[in-house]
Amino acid sequence: MAARTDNSIVVNAPFELVWDVTNDIEAWPELFSEYAEAEILRQDGDGFDFRLKTRPDANGRVWEWVSHRVPDKGSRTVRAHRVETGPFAYMNLHWTYRAVAGGTEMRWVQEFDMKPGAPFDNAHMTAHLNTTTRANMERIKKIIEDRHREGQRTPASVLPTELHAQQLLLLAASGRLARIVHVLTELRIADLLADGPRHVAELAKETDTHELSLYRVLRSAASVGVFAEGPVRTFSATPLSDGLRTGNPDGVLPLVKYNNMELTRRPYDEIMHSVRTGEPAFRRVFGSSFFEHLEANPEAGEFFERFMAHWSRRLVLDGLADQGMERFSRIADLGGGDGWFLAQILRRHPHATGLLMDLPRVAASAGPVLEEAKVADRVTVLPGDFFTDPVPTGYDAYLFKGVLHNWSDERAVTVLRRVREAIGDDDARLLIFDQVMAPENEWDHAKLLDIDMLVLFGGRERVLAEWRQLLLEADFDIVNTPSHTWTTLECRPV
Protein backbone atom coordinates (compact mmCIF):
# COMPACT_ATOMS: atom_id res chain seq x y z
CA MET A 1 0.00 0.00 0.00
CA ALA A 2 1.34 3.45 -0.93
CA ALA A 3 2.49 5.83 1.81
CA ARG A 4 2.14 9.57 2.27
CA THR A 5 3.60 12.31 4.44
CA ASP A 6 2.05 15.75 4.82
CA ASN A 7 3.87 18.49 6.74
CA SER A 8 3.48 22.25 6.86
CA ILE A 9 5.01 25.24 8.59
CA VAL A 10 4.31 28.98 8.68
CA VAL A 11 7.27 31.19 7.78
CA ASN A 12 7.07 34.78 9.01
CA ALA A 13 8.05 36.25 5.66
CA PRO A 14 6.31 37.29 2.41
CA PHE A 15 5.53 34.72 -0.27
CA GLU A 16 8.03 36.17 -2.77
CA LEU A 17 10.95 35.62 -0.41
CA VAL A 18 9.80 32.15 0.69
CA TRP A 19 9.31 31.08 -2.93
CA ASP A 20 12.62 32.48 -4.17
CA VAL A 21 14.68 30.92 -1.38
CA THR A 22 13.10 27.47 -1.44
CA ASN A 23 13.18 27.20 -5.24
CA ASP A 24 16.84 28.16 -5.62
CA ILE A 25 17.93 24.55 -6.20
CA GLU A 26 21.65 25.23 -6.35
CA ALA A 27 21.46 26.75 -2.83
CA TRP A 28 19.75 23.69 -1.33
CA PRO A 29 22.94 22.45 0.40
CA GLU A 30 22.60 25.54 2.59
CA LEU A 31 18.90 24.93 3.26
CA PHE A 32 18.80 21.15 3.72
CA SER A 33 21.12 19.61 6.28
CA GLU A 34 21.55 16.32 4.38
CA TYR A 35 22.45 17.66 0.90
CA ALA A 36 26.08 18.21 -0.08
CA GLU A 37 25.58 19.09 -3.77
CA ALA A 38 22.72 20.19 -6.03
CA GLU A 39 23.15 20.51 -9.80
CA ILE A 40 20.64 21.46 -12.50
CA LEU A 41 21.18 19.09 -15.44
CA ARG A 42 18.72 20.21 -18.11
CA GLN A 43 15.73 22.50 -18.51
CA ASP A 44 12.66 22.14 -20.73
CA GLY A 45 9.43 24.05 -21.26
CA ASP A 46 7.68 23.10 -18.05
CA GLY A 47 10.45 22.20 -15.65
CA PHE A 48 13.96 20.88 -15.20
CA ASP A 49 15.98 17.83 -14.15
CA PHE A 50 18.44 18.15 -11.28
CA ARG A 51 20.77 15.90 -9.32
CA LEU A 52 21.09 15.81 -5.52
CA LYS A 53 24.00 14.28 -3.64
CA THR A 54 23.88 13.71 0.12
CA ARG A 55 26.45 14.08 2.80
CA PRO A 56 27.71 10.73 4.17
CA ASP A 57 25.14 8.98 6.36
CA ALA A 58 25.87 7.24 9.68
CA ASN A 59 27.43 4.34 7.77
CA GLY A 60 29.57 6.59 5.59
CA ARG A 61 27.45 6.02 2.48
CA VAL A 62 26.69 8.82 0.02
CA TRP A 63 23.41 8.77 -1.92
CA GLU A 64 22.53 10.61 -5.12
CA TRP A 65 19.61 10.68 -7.53
CA VAL A 66 17.99 12.70 -10.34
CA SER A 67 14.56 14.33 -9.99
CA HIS A 68 12.29 16.34 -12.29
CA ARG A 69 10.72 19.51 -10.89
CA VAL A 70 7.94 21.75 -12.24
CA PRO A 71 7.52 25.03 -10.31
CA ASP A 72 4.46 27.22 -11.05
CA LYS A 73 4.75 30.53 -9.24
CA GLY A 74 1.37 31.70 -10.53
CA SER A 75 -0.49 28.90 -8.74
CA ARG A 76 2.05 28.83 -5.90
CA THR A 77 2.69 25.13 -6.39
CA VAL A 78 5.61 22.84 -7.21
CA ARG A 79 5.33 19.28 -8.47
CA ALA A 80 8.29 16.92 -8.61
CA HIS A 81 9.16 13.26 -8.91
CA ARG A 82 12.27 11.14 -8.73
CA VAL A 83 13.57 10.04 -12.12
CA GLU A 84 16.13 7.74 -10.50
CA THR A 85 14.01 6.16 -7.79
CA GLY A 86 16.59 4.06 -5.91
CA PRO A 87 14.83 2.03 -3.19
CA PHE A 88 11.49 3.65 -4.03
CA ALA A 89 9.03 2.18 -6.51
CA TYR A 90 8.13 5.84 -7.03
CA MET A 91 8.40 9.14 -5.17
CA ASN A 92 6.15 12.11 -5.99
CA LEU A 93 6.30 15.48 -4.23
CA HIS A 94 3.86 18.38 -4.13
CA TRP A 95 4.69 21.72 -2.52
CA THR A 96 2.13 24.47 -1.97
CA TYR A 97 2.45 28.00 -0.61
CA ARG A 98 -0.37 30.02 0.95
CA ALA A 99 -0.65 33.40 2.64
CA VAL A 100 -1.89 33.04 6.22
CA ALA A 101 -1.92 35.11 9.38
CA GLY A 102 1.69 35.42 10.43
CA GLY A 103 3.31 34.91 7.02
CA THR A 104 3.43 32.20 4.37
CA GLU A 105 2.37 28.62 4.96
CA MET A 106 4.62 26.12 3.20
CA ARG A 107 3.19 22.60 2.82
CA TRP A 108 5.12 19.55 1.55
CA VAL A 109 3.37 16.32 0.58
CA GLN A 110 5.38 13.21 -0.35
CA GLU A 111 3.68 10.17 -1.88
CA PHE A 112 5.76 7.03 -2.34
CA ASP A 113 6.02 3.28 -2.19
CA MET A 114 9.09 1.25 -1.28
CA LYS A 115 10.32 -1.50 -3.58
CA PRO A 116 10.04 -5.09 -2.35
CA GLY A 117 13.30 -5.97 -0.65
CA ALA A 118 14.21 -2.34 0.11
CA PRO A 119 16.08 -1.87 3.42
CA PHE A 120 13.10 0.06 4.85
CA ASP A 121 9.37 -0.57 4.58
CA ASN A 122 6.77 2.16 4.09
CA ALA A 123 6.15 2.63 7.81
CA HIS A 124 9.84 3.14 8.65
CA MET A 125 10.34 5.46 5.69
CA THR A 126 7.25 7.48 6.65
CA ALA A 127 8.61 8.00 10.17
CA HIS A 128 12.05 8.91 8.80
CA LEU A 129 10.67 11.36 6.23
CA ASN A 130 8.39 13.02 8.79
CA THR A 131 11.34 13.51 11.15
CA THR A 132 13.73 14.89 8.54
CA THR A 133 11.05 17.02 6.85
CA ARG A 134 10.06 18.71 10.10
CA ALA A 135 13.69 19.34 11.00
CA ASN A 136 14.43 20.81 7.55
CA MET A 137 11.30 22.95 7.65
CA GLU A 138 12.39 24.43 10.97
CA ARG A 139 15.88 25.02 9.56
CA ILE A 140 14.54 26.70 6.40
CA LYS A 141 12.07 28.77 8.41
CA LYS A 142 14.91 30.19 10.52
CA ILE A 143 17.08 30.94 7.48
CA ILE A 144 14.27 32.76 5.65
CA GLU A 145 13.05 34.66 8.71
CA ASP A 146 16.62 35.77 9.48
CA ARG A 147 16.95 37.08 5.91
CA HIS A 148 13.58 38.79 6.17
CA ARG A 149 14.57 40.52 9.40
CA GLU A 150 17.87 41.64 7.87
CA GLY A 151 15.96 43.19 4.99
CA GLN A 152 13.62 45.02 7.37
CA ARG A 153 16.30 46.60 9.56
CA THR A 154 15.73 50.22 8.61
CA PRO A 155 14.89 53.11 10.95
CA ALA A 156 11.26 52.95 9.82
CA SER A 157 10.92 49.32 10.85
CA VAL A 158 11.16 50.17 14.53
CA LEU A 159 8.22 52.59 14.37
CA PRO A 160 4.68 51.38 15.18
CA THR A 161 3.11 50.19 11.93
CA GLU A 162 -0.21 48.77 10.93
CA LEU A 163 1.42 45.35 10.51
CA HIS A 164 2.81 45.42 14.04
CA ALA A 165 -0.55 46.53 15.39
CA GLN A 166 -2.35 43.71 13.59
CA GLN A 167 0.14 41.14 14.86
CA LEU A 168 -0.25 42.40 18.41
CA LEU A 169 -4.03 42.38 18.05
CA LEU A 170 -3.92 38.77 16.90
CA LEU A 171 -1.87 37.83 19.96
CA ALA A 172 -4.22 39.71 22.28
CA ALA A 173 -7.22 37.92 20.74
CA SER A 174 -5.64 34.47 20.79
CA GLY A 175 -7.80 33.41 23.74
CA ARG A 176 -10.88 33.91 21.57
CA LEU A 177 -9.29 31.96 18.74
CA ALA A 178 -8.50 29.08 21.09
CA ARG A 179 -12.16 28.90 22.14
CA ILE A 180 -13.28 29.02 18.50
CA VAL A 181 -10.97 26.13 17.58
CA HIS A 182 -12.23 24.18 20.58
CA VAL A 183 -15.89 24.65 19.59
CA LEU A 184 -15.21 23.53 16.02
CA THR A 185 -13.30 20.56 17.40
CA GLU A 186 -16.22 19.56 19.63
CA LEU A 187 -18.49 19.76 16.56
CA ARG A 188 -16.05 17.55 14.58
CA ILE A 189 -16.04 19.99 11.65
CA ALA A 190 -12.63 18.73 10.46
CA ASP A 191 -14.05 15.20 10.16
CA LEU A 192 -17.11 16.46 8.28
CA LEU A 193 -14.88 18.26 5.73
CA ALA A 194 -12.46 15.37 5.25
CA ASP A 195 -14.06 14.35 1.94
CA GLY A 196 -14.30 17.82 0.41
CA PRO A 197 -15.95 21.26 0.66
CA ARG A 198 -19.44 21.58 2.12
CA HIS A 199 -21.99 24.35 2.54
CA VAL A 200 -22.44 25.76 6.02
CA ALA A 201 -26.14 24.79 5.91
CA GLU A 202 -25.17 21.11 5.65
CA LEU A 203 -22.68 21.46 8.46
CA ALA A 204 -25.23 23.21 10.69
CA LYS A 205 -27.78 20.47 10.07
CA GLU A 206 -25.31 17.68 10.86
CA THR A 207 -24.05 19.40 14.01
CA ASP A 208 -27.44 20.67 15.23
CA THR A 209 -26.23 24.27 15.34
CA HIS A 210 -27.56 27.69 14.32
CA GLU A 211 -26.50 28.17 10.70
CA LEU A 212 -25.60 31.87 10.82
CA SER A 213 -23.76 31.51 14.12
CA LEU A 214 -21.79 28.51 12.84
CA TYR A 215 -20.93 30.49 9.71
CA ARG A 216 -19.60 33.39 11.78
CA VAL A 217 -17.41 31.07 13.84
CA LEU A 218 -16.10 29.25 10.75
CA ARG A 219 -15.42 32.57 9.01
CA SER A 220 -13.33 33.71 11.96
CA ALA A 221 -11.38 30.43 12.00
CA ALA A 222 -10.77 30.64 8.25
CA SER A 223 -9.21 34.09 8.68
CA VAL A 224 -6.24 32.42 10.40
CA GLY A 225 -6.02 29.38 8.12
CA VAL A 226 -8.10 26.92 10.15
CA PHE A 227 -10.46 25.84 7.31
CA ALA A 228 -10.89 27.87 4.13
CA GLU A 229 -13.98 29.77 3.05
CA GLY A 230 -15.09 29.35 -0.56
CA PRO A 231 -17.93 30.76 -2.67
CA VAL A 232 -21.45 31.08 -1.24
CA ARG A 233 -20.52 30.08 2.30
CA THR A 234 -18.82 26.80 1.55
CA PHE A 235 -15.88 25.64 3.64
CA SER A 236 -13.04 23.21 3.01
CA ALA A 237 -10.18 21.64 4.93
CA THR A 238 -6.67 23.11 5.16
CA PRO A 239 -3.35 21.72 6.42
CA LEU A 240 -4.08 23.39 9.77
CA SER A 241 -7.57 21.94 10.10
CA ASP A 242 -6.30 18.48 9.14
CA GLY A 243 -4.56 18.47 12.51
CA LEU A 244 -8.01 18.46 14.13
CA ARG A 245 -9.24 15.28 12.43
CA THR A 246 -10.05 12.29 14.60
CA GLY A 247 -7.40 9.60 14.35
CA ASN A 248 -4.73 11.78 12.71
CA PRO A 249 -1.48 10.51 14.32
CA ASP A 250 0.22 13.85 13.59
CA GLY A 251 -2.75 15.88 14.82
CA VAL A 252 -3.26 18.00 17.92
CA LEU A 253 -6.86 17.08 18.71
CA PRO A 254 -6.09 15.82 22.25
CA LEU A 255 -4.05 18.96 22.94
CA VAL A 256 -6.95 21.22 21.89
CA LYS A 257 -9.29 19.35 24.23
CA TYR A 258 -6.74 19.35 27.05
CA ASN A 259 -6.18 23.10 26.77
CA ASN A 260 -9.92 23.76 27.09
CA MET A 261 -10.63 21.57 30.12
CA GLU A 262 -11.72 23.33 33.28
CA LEU A 263 -8.64 22.13 35.16
CA THR A 264 -6.26 23.72 32.62
CA ARG A 265 -8.32 26.81 31.75
CA ARG A 266 -9.45 28.18 35.12
CA PRO A 267 -6.00 28.48 36.74
CA TYR A 268 -4.98 30.94 34.00
CA ASP A 269 -7.48 33.40 35.47
CA GLU A 270 -5.07 33.50 38.44
CA ILE A 271 -1.78 33.60 36.50
CA MET A 272 -0.85 36.83 38.27
CA HIS A 273 -0.66 34.83 41.51
CA SER A 274 1.99 32.59 39.92
CA VAL A 275 3.91 35.54 38.51
CA ARG A 276 3.98 37.31 41.89
CA THR A 277 4.70 34.28 44.09
CA GLY A 278 6.28 31.62 41.87
CA GLU A 279 3.63 29.18 43.09
CA PRO A 280 1.21 27.25 40.86
CA ALA A 281 -2.16 28.98 40.58
CA PHE A 282 -3.79 25.56 40.30
CA ARG A 283 -3.70 25.04 44.07
CA ARG A 284 -5.18 28.51 44.66
CA VAL A 285 -8.12 27.66 42.35
CA PHE A 286 -8.77 24.01 43.21
CA GLY A 287 -7.33 23.69 46.71
CA SER A 288 -4.96 20.85 45.79
CA SER A 289 -2.05 20.09 43.49
CA PHE A 290 -2.68 19.06 39.88
CA PHE A 291 -1.94 15.39 40.50
CA GLU A 292 -3.90 15.31 43.77
CA HIS A 293 -6.86 16.68 41.80
CA LEU A 294 -6.52 13.89 39.22
CA GLU A 295 -6.50 11.28 41.99
CA ALA A 296 -9.72 12.74 43.43
CA ASN A 297 -11.41 13.12 40.02
CA PRO A 298 -11.03 9.84 38.09
CA GLU A 299 -12.70 11.12 34.92
CA ALA A 300 -10.20 13.98 34.61
CA GLY A 301 -7.40 11.59 35.53
CA GLU A 302 -8.37 9.13 32.81
CA PHE A 303 -8.47 11.89 30.18
CA PHE A 304 -5.05 13.16 31.26
CA GLU A 305 -3.58 9.65 30.92
CA ARG A 306 -5.11 9.31 27.43
CA PHE A 307 -3.65 12.69 26.53
CA MET A 308 -0.20 11.65 27.74
CA ALA A 309 -0.50 8.36 25.85
CA HIS A 310 -1.18 10.34 22.66
CA TRP A 311 2.08 12.25 23.11
CA SER A 312 3.92 9.00 23.81
CA ARG A 313 2.82 7.85 20.38
CA ARG A 314 4.02 11.11 18.84
CA LEU A 315 7.44 10.65 20.41
CA VAL A 316 7.70 7.10 19.07
CA LEU A 317 6.75 8.34 15.60
CA ASP A 318 9.47 10.98 15.91
CA GLY A 319 12.02 8.24 16.60
CA LEU A 320 12.71 8.77 20.30
CA ALA A 321 12.11 5.07 21.05
CA ASP A 322 15.04 4.12 18.80
CA GLN A 323 17.81 6.08 20.53
CA GLY A 324 20.40 3.31 20.85
CA MET A 325 18.14 1.16 23.01
CA GLU A 326 19.65 -2.05 21.59
CA ARG A 327 22.47 -1.60 24.14
CA PHE A 328 20.20 -2.35 27.08
CA SER A 329 18.71 -5.62 28.30
CA ARG A 330 16.89 -4.47 31.47
CA ILE A 331 14.96 -1.22 31.11
CA ALA A 332 13.04 0.56 33.91
CA ASP A 333 10.47 3.17 32.82
CA LEU A 334 9.71 5.40 35.82
CA GLY A 335 6.41 7.26 35.61
CA GLY A 336 5.73 5.37 32.38
CA GLY A 337 1.94 5.73 32.34
CA ASP A 338 0.10 2.86 30.67
CA GLY A 339 3.37 1.39 29.36
CA TRP A 340 2.86 2.12 25.67
CA PHE A 341 6.25 3.80 25.22
CA LEU A 342 8.09 0.99 27.02
CA ALA A 343 6.13 -1.58 24.99
CA GLN A 344 7.30 -0.03 21.71
CA ILE A 345 10.92 -0.19 22.87
CA LEU A 346 10.57 -3.86 23.85
CA ARG A 347 8.85 -4.71 20.57
CA ARG A 348 11.85 -3.32 18.72
CA HIS A 349 14.33 -5.12 21.00
CA PRO A 350 13.08 -8.65 21.78
CA HIS A 351 16.16 -9.47 23.88
CA ALA A 352 15.19 -6.88 26.52
CA THR A 353 12.91 -6.99 29.55
CA GLY A 354 11.32 -4.05 31.30
CA LEU A 355 9.86 -2.63 34.47
CA LEU A 356 7.00 -0.11 34.53
CA MET A 357 6.58 2.01 37.66
CA ASP A 358 3.74 4.49 38.15
CA LEU A 359 1.03 5.40 40.64
CA PRO A 360 -1.40 2.53 41.32
CA ARG A 361 -4.31 4.17 39.46
CA VAL A 362 -2.16 4.65 36.38
CA ALA A 363 -0.28 1.35 36.49
CA ALA A 364 -3.60 -0.49 36.64
CA SER A 365 -4.25 0.49 33.01
CA ALA A 366 -1.04 -1.09 31.69
CA GLY A 367 -2.18 -4.70 31.36
CA PRO A 368 -4.23 -4.41 28.13
CA VAL A 369 -1.59 -2.17 26.52
CA LEU A 370 1.23 -4.60 27.22
CA GLU A 371 -0.89 -7.58 26.14
CA GLU A 372 -1.79 -5.92 22.85
CA ALA A 373 1.90 -5.24 22.17
CA LYS A 374 2.67 -8.89 23.06
CA VAL A 375 5.29 -7.90 25.64
CA ALA A 376 3.37 -8.48 28.87
CA ASP A 377 5.49 -11.53 29.69
CA ARG A 378 8.62 -9.35 29.58
CA VAL A 379 7.37 -6.47 31.78
CA THR A 380 7.09 -6.23 35.56
CA VAL A 381 4.42 -3.69 36.54
CA LEU A 382 5.25 -2.03 39.86
CA PRO A 383 2.58 0.30 41.33
CA GLY A 384 4.35 2.94 43.36
CA ASP A 385 5.49 6.53 43.87
CA PHE A 386 9.13 7.16 42.96
CA PHE A 387 9.27 9.97 45.55
CA THR A 388 8.44 7.66 48.46
CA ASP A 389 8.78 4.03 47.33
CA PRO A 390 12.14 2.34 46.62
CA VAL A 391 13.44 2.74 43.07
CA PRO A 392 14.20 -0.79 41.77
CA THR A 393 17.84 -1.77 41.40
CA GLY A 394 19.64 -3.92 38.84
CA TYR A 395 18.57 -2.19 35.61
CA ASP A 396 21.00 -0.99 32.96
CA ALA A 397 18.71 1.79 31.68
CA TYR A 398 16.34 4.04 33.64
CA LEU A 399 13.85 6.15 31.65
CA PHE A 400 11.97 9.35 32.42
CA LYS A 401 9.65 10.42 29.58
CA GLY A 402 7.92 13.78 29.96
CA VAL A 403 8.16 13.48 33.76
CA LEU A 404 10.85 15.77 35.14
CA HIS A 405 9.42 18.95 33.62
CA ASN A 406 6.41 18.49 35.93
CA TRP A 407 8.56 19.23 38.96
CA SER A 408 10.55 22.10 40.42
CA ASP A 409 14.33 21.80 40.44
CA GLU A 410 14.25 20.79 44.11
CA ARG A 411 11.73 17.99 43.55
CA ALA A 412 13.42 16.85 40.33
CA VAL A 413 16.81 16.60 42.04
CA THR A 414 15.19 14.54 44.81
CA VAL A 415 13.94 11.87 42.44
CA LEU A 416 17.13 11.95 40.35
CA ARG A 417 19.19 11.29 43.47
CA ARG A 418 16.96 8.31 44.27
CA VAL A 419 17.69 6.89 40.82
CA ARG A 420 21.40 7.56 41.34
CA GLU A 421 21.27 5.60 44.60
CA ALA A 422 19.51 2.72 42.84
CA ILE A 423 22.25 2.59 40.17
CA GLY A 424 25.05 2.57 42.73
CA ASP A 425 28.27 1.32 41.11
CA ASP A 426 26.49 -0.34 38.17
CA ASP A 427 27.34 0.64 34.60
CA ALA A 428 23.83 1.95 33.89
CA ARG A 429 22.44 4.90 31.97
CA LEU A 430 19.70 7.40 32.72
CA LEU A 431 17.71 8.37 29.60
CA ILE A 432 15.53 11.47 29.87
CA PHE A 433 13.03 12.02 27.06
CA ASP A 434 12.01 15.64 27.58
CA GLN A 435 12.22 19.10 26.10
CA VAL A 436 15.28 21.31 25.79
CA MET A 437 14.16 24.86 25.15
CA ALA A 438 15.48 26.74 22.13
CA PRO A 439 17.70 29.83 22.60
CA GLU A 440 16.30 33.26 23.35
CA ASN A 441 13.94 34.91 20.83
CA GLU A 442 13.30 31.66 18.92
CA TRP A 443 9.81 30.20 18.66
CA ASP A 444 9.52 26.98 20.64
CA HIS A 445 6.29 25.40 21.90
CA ALA A 446 8.23 24.46 25.04
CA LYS A 447 8.27 28.15 26.00
CA LEU A 448 4.47 28.13 26.16
CA LEU A 449 4.42 24.76 27.89
CA ASP A 450 6.79 26.28 30.44
CA ILE A 451 3.96 28.60 31.49
CA ASP A 452 1.70 25.57 31.95
CA MET A 453 4.39 24.19 34.22
CA LEU A 454 4.39 27.44 36.20
CA VAL A 455 0.61 27.86 36.49
CA LEU A 456 -0.55 24.23 36.74
CA PHE A 457 2.23 22.04 38.10
CA GLY A 458 4.92 24.08 39.78
CA GLY A 459 7.44 22.57 37.36
CA ARG A 460 9.44 24.07 34.51
CA GLU A 461 10.94 23.52 31.08
CA ARG A 462 14.71 23.93 30.89
CA VAL A 463 17.45 25.08 28.56
CA LEU A 464 20.44 22.77 28.16
CA ALA A 465 22.59 24.59 30.73
CA GLU A 466 19.81 24.19 33.32
CA TRP A 467 19.53 20.48 32.55
CA ARG A 468 23.29 20.09 33.02
CA GLN A 469 23.20 21.85 36.39
CA LEU A 470 20.18 19.86 37.57
CA LEU A 471 21.78 16.55 36.67
CA LEU A 472 25.15 17.53 38.13
CA GLU A 473 23.46 18.12 41.50
CA ALA A 474 22.25 14.50 41.36
CA ASP A 475 25.68 13.16 40.27
CA PHE A 476 24.86 12.61 36.61
CA ASP A 477 26.61 13.93 33.51
CA ILE A 478 25.06 14.36 30.03
CA VAL A 479 27.12 12.36 27.52
CA ASN A 480 25.31 13.11 24.24
CA THR A 481 24.45 16.31 22.36
CA PRO A 482 20.69 16.87 22.76
CA SER A 483 18.74 18.80 20.15
CA HIS A 484 16.04 21.35 20.95
CA THR A 485 12.34 20.59 21.53
CA TRP A 486 11.59 16.94 22.39
CA THR A 487 14.89 15.14 22.60
CA THR A 488 16.93 12.56 24.49
CA LEU A 489 19.40 13.39 27.25
CA GLU A 490 21.65 10.38 27.88
CA CYS A 491 23.29 10.57 31.29
CA ARG A 492 25.92 8.51 33.07
CA PRO A 493 26.51 8.40 36.82
CA VAL A 494 29.57 10.26 38.10
UniProtKB/Swiss-Prot annotation:
Temperature dependence: Thermal resistance is enhanced at low protein and high salt concentrations, is pH-dependent and denaturation is irreversible.
Pfam families the UniProt entry points to: Dimerisation, Methyltransf_2, Polyketide_cyc
Any single GO BP term: antibiotic biosynthetic process
Positions bound to S-adenosyl-L-methionine: 358, 384-386
Enzyme Commission number(s) of this protein: 2.1.1.-, 2.3.1.235
SUPFAM superfamilies in the record: Bet v1-like, S-adenosyl-L-methionine-dependent methyltransferases, Winged helix' DNA-binding domain
Outcome when changing residue 63 to N: Decrease in the production of the first ring
Pathways involved: Antibiotic biosynthesis; tetracenomycin C biosynthesis
Recorded consequence of changing residue 35 to T: Strong decrease in the production of the first ring
Ranges where the record places region Methyltransferase: 169-494
Keywords assigned by UniProt, alphabetized: Antibiotic biosynthesis, Methyltransferase, Multifunctional enzyme, S-adenosyl-L-methionine, Transferase
KW Methyltransferase (keyword) present: yes
Annotated catalysed reactions: 10 malonyl-CoA + 8 H(+) = tetracenomycin F2 + 10 CO2 + 10 CoA + 2 H2O
Mutant lacking the gene: phenotype: In the absence of TcmN, the linear polyketide intermediate formed by the minimal PKS consisting of the TcmJKLM proteins undergoes spontaneous cyclization to form some TCM F2 as well as SEK15 and many other aberrant shunt products.
Positions of the UniProt region annotated as Polyketide cyclase: 11-140
PROSITE patterns (alphabetical): SAM_OMT_II (PS51683)
Entry's Gene Ontology molecular function annotations: O-methyltransferase activity; protein dimerization activity
UniProt pH dependence: Optimum pH is 8.0 for methyltransferase activity.
Active site per the UniProt annotation: 67, 69, 82, 405
Family stated for the protein in its record: In the C-terminal section; belongs to the class I-like SAM-binding methyltransferase superfamily. Cation-independent O-methyltransferase family.
Function: Involved in the biosynthesis of tetracenomycin C (TCM C). Part of a type II polyketide synthase (PKS) that catalyzes the synthesis of tetracenomycin F2 (TCM F2), a precursor of TCM C, from malonyl-CoA. The TcmN N-terminal domain, when coupled with the other components of the PKS, catalyzes the cyclization and aromatization of the linear polyketide intermediate. Catalyzes the cyclization of the first and second rings. In addition, the C-terminal domain acts as a methyltransferase.
Subunit structure: The tetracenomycin polyketide synthase (TCM PKS) is composed of a ketosynthase complex (TcmKL), an acyl carrier protein (TcmM), a cyclase (TcmN) and a probable second cyclase (TcmJ). TcmN is a homodimer in solution.
Record-given protein name: Tetracenomycin biosynthesis bifunctional cyclase/O-methyl transferase TcmN
